[in-house]
Structure formats: C-alpha cells, structure tokens
UniProtKB/Swiss-Prot annotation:
Cofactor: prenylated FMN; Mn(2+)
Biological pathway: Cofactor biosynthesis; ubiquinone biosynthesis
Residues bound to prenylated FMN: I175, Y176, R177, R189, W190, L191, R194, G195
Pfam families reported for this sequence: UbiD, UbiD_C, UbiD_N
Catalytic activity, reaction form: a 4-hydroxy-3-(all-trans-polyprenyl)benzoate + H(+) = a 2-(all-trans-polyprenyl)phenol + CO2
Protein name: 3-octaprenyl-4-hydroxybenzoate carboxy-lyase
GO molecular function, one term: metal ion binding
One GO CC term, this protein: plasma membrane
Gene: ubiD
Gene3D superfamilies named among the record's database cross-references: Single helix bin (1.20.5.570), UbiD C-terminal domain-like (3.40.1670.10)
Cofactor binding notes: Binds 1 prenylated FMN per subunit.
SUPFAM superfamilies named among the record's database cross-references: FMN-binding split barrel, UbiD C-terminal domain-like
Function per UniProt: Catalyzes the decarboxylation of 3-octaprenyl-4-hydroxy benzoate to 2-octaprenylphenol, an intermediate step in ubiquinone biosynthesis.
Amino acid sequence: MQYRDLRDFIRGLEQRGELKRIQVPISPVLEMTEVCDRTLRAKGPALLFEKPTGFDIPVLGNLFGTPERVAMGMGAESTEELREIGKLLAFLKEPEPPKGLKDAWSKLPIFKKVVSMAPKVVKDAVCQEIVVEGDDVDLSQLPIQHCWPGDVAPLITWGLTVTRGPNKDRQNLGIYRQQVIGRNKVIMRWLSHRGGALDYREWCQKHPGQPFPVAVALGADPATILGAVTPVPDTLSEYAFAGLLRGNRTELVKCRGNDLQVPATAEIILEGVIHPGEMAPEGPYGDHTGYYNEVDSFPVFTVERITHRQKPIYHSTYTGRPPDEPAILGVALNEVFVPILQKQFPEIVDFYLPPEGCSYRMAVVTMKKQYPGHAKRVMLGVWSFLRQFMYTKFVIVTDDDINARDWNDVIWAITTRMDPKRDTVMIDNTPIDYLDFASPVSGLGSKMGLDATHKWPGETTREWGRVIVKDEAVTRRIDELWDQLGID
C-alpha cells in the first residue's frame, strides 16, 4: 500500500494496530526518549504523543521502530519484498544492454515507469498553509526533543535537508541532525562527504561570501523520508525514487524565499540560509554508538521562515546504543542492499549488517568462493562499491555454508577457518565516521577484513579439514524412533 503523506501513513498504521496515541502529557525533555526506547525494544507500535508537555503540536515517535514499518513506508507488504526494491535499484544503477529485441521490449516498461515518476511541481501546498517570517520565527515553539541527560540542547533529528549545488539541476536530500542554538538558528551537522556539504562547498567556491539557500522538511511522507536514506543511483533523484515507491509522482512546491523545491505535503518547512564562515561548536550529543560524541564545529543554518500545515505534527526520534531507529532502518535496508551488491558481485550469497554493530560498522558476507584471494576481492569491493559502507570498520567474509545472520555460525567459521596473520587485512588512513572516537584521528582510521573462508591451494600448503556431516540414513532412523526413546 502506498501513502500520500505522513497523515495517510499514520491512519494506515493505526488501522493495523501499529500506532498508539498517547494522551498522557509526556515531556520532550528526556521522557519521550524513555518511552520510545522501551517501546522500540519491545517491538512496539509507533507513538503519537498528542499532549507533549508545554506544547500544542503533537510529536510522532518510533515511526520506523520495526523493519515491518520500514517496509510499509516503502510501499512493501513485508521485509521480503524489500529485495524487489533492491533489484530495481540494482538494475537502474547498472542497466545491462538488452540481449535482443524481445529483451529490450521487456525492459521498456521499467524505463517508462521511471520517466513517468519525475516530480510534479504545484503552485499551492498544504505545507505553506501557515507562514511565519522574520522576528516571529521561534524554534522554541516546536516540541523538539532533548534526548539524553548529557545533550547540550534540543536536537532536530528527522529533518530532510534540501540543497542544490551551483552546477546541478538535481536537488540533494539528506538527513542531518541539527542542534538548536537560538530562536532562528541551528547547527547543520553534515559530514564532508555528504551531498549537502558538497553542495555547500561548491557554492562557496562559485559564489564566495554569498548566503547558501537551504530548506528543511519535517514530517514528509514515508517514501520521501526513506528515499533520502536509500542508495539511489546518481541518475535518479530521491524525489523520483519516492514516486516509484509511492506509485505516484512526488508533489513539490517552491519555497517562499528561495528556488528550492520541498515536499508539498510535509508537515513543517524551515527555510533559510547558511552564511559562509558562520560556524559554531556542535555537541556533545548521545549518538547511535551509545556514547556522547566530542564537540566539533559545523555551519550555522539561519531560519528565515517557517511554513507549516494547519495543526502540524512534529516527527522526531532519538539515537543511542542499538537497538534504536537507525539500527532498525539498517536491518530493513539490509534487504535492499543485498541485490545491489549481488548485481556487482554475483558470488555474494548473503550480506548482513548486525544491528549491534551500530547500523553499518560491521558487515558479514557469505559467498561462493571460486579462486584463491577471492574473499579479499569481495571485502575490498564492499568497502568501495556503495558509499553507505565507506565507514564499515569490519568486514567478515565466509563461505555459503555459513548463515551470515547466525553468530554461532560466524564465530565457528572465524575460529576454525582463519589464521590471524594470513587472513586478516588491515587498511590504514581510511575515512571513518567522525562520531567514532576510537579512531586515532577524527574522521580517519583503519579497517579490518577477516577472511573466514575455506582456504584453497595457494593460500595454504596444508591439507584442509573436512566438515563433519551426519549419516542421513541414521538421522532418518533416529527421527522415526525418537518419540519411543522418551527423552523429550
């Protein structure tokens, strides 16, 4: 089922028993985090806090707190269907030339559908029903969460940041956390390799000293939100991909104060600029690592205008030691990643990002090994193929007789098929998440690959062990006798 906007999604969740309305007053300061954390760990519903303490704007939390709700937001009925979305993205990322006329005709509907999902620009939009400008702009009127006791200030977490570089027609959508530092100012924490930061850098080079236009959409429809965190091919905009997920074109509207286009059905829009050179220290904040991050300097976004729907809903989350929403998103999007990786590396059987690994810091790959050194080729490919894995610190590669999602299997493979010196790949001075304080330099650290595959001639001079396999006939006989033995 597809959802036109966030409210449509809320109705759909409520009909399925996947959303709970909370009418007891709950404070955005620490209390919502506690309630959402307990609910997420219990695999509970999305939560709509209808009476946040001190505010008259409801807060939506734990929206993507289960993989099933992530799948629903992407228009799928189950997490298994996410593989089909991954196959579509794999095809669009690396389209193969048709093998003949019949093959060309079979692929034509896919390309026609992609072309037909170009965003639609509208003149009037519900996200601009109410306009607040100038001195009336006051972010303290929004129920922005203060998530952890050691957090320095309230933090906008689910803001969909819209930017455009000076040499680009396509807009970039990214989700970057934003520390509130004044009634109309937030700190835009985007890492240097992210699309928004790249657009800003190019703008400063081409238009030195001129303000950089930015818009932030809060409470967009689920397909647009999830499109911003999915590995969309560079040839496809996030808005067009959201249209594919939703089954109809994404409606956009031009901002009141700049030329950026934002989701027309979003709940709240922040419009403004970043003045080149205006920076501020950001943090500390509790993050998805389970620790407070160190303070670092990032650009300041000045909010010049807030537009919103009548009676808007504020969409929020928290991040902490897994499980949290980013970890759950990682579990669901894992199913999207598998076909994309298999398109490039057909020998990959499965790929798994354990949620305990903070969404992306560890990956387990199972493969059909075909030659000496093959496992090392695959681990290097994982690091380099998708930018989502540039911060993955540990890649474990093992054979296809191992279940990548079963630690008992994986640990058995590591401890029986690896020689630590021969089968460990260490790479130094590589990009690392700035939130990773374990790295010796902020943003720069090492990576480790573990080759836990059976070794081929050329990789070892020893006779390799044979896996113990039970006798099938004996197993069948004992199955037949089992009830008579009285053991269970």
